[in-house]
UniProtKB/Swiss-Prot annotation:
It comes from Swinepox virus (strain Kasza). It comes from the Viruses. This is Uncharacterized protein C18.
Length: 67
């Protein structure tokens, strides 16, 4: 019984580490995209992604159009 609980705890820690690592990679990936993004022109005007908000459980990207 004790071994089963220990395995569950180890899997939980491993899963948590994977989630933290993947969220960091996702944020780093978005920043790299923003650094190398050329302006995109649409019917609404020039597309510019202005702000990345970091929350406790993830990220949101504010997208604005410049006329």
């Amino acid at each position: 019984m004790h071994l089963k609980n220990e395995v569950n705890n180890n899997m939980f820690v491993f899963t948590l580490c994977i989630l933290l690592y993947s969220s960091f990679c996702y944020f780093f990936y978005i920043e790299k995209i923003l650094q190398h993004t050329k302006p995109i022109y649409t019917n609404y005007g020039q597309l510019c992604i202005c702000k990345i908000n970091k929350y406790k459980y993830g990220y949101s990207v504010n997208i604005f159009y410049r006329r």
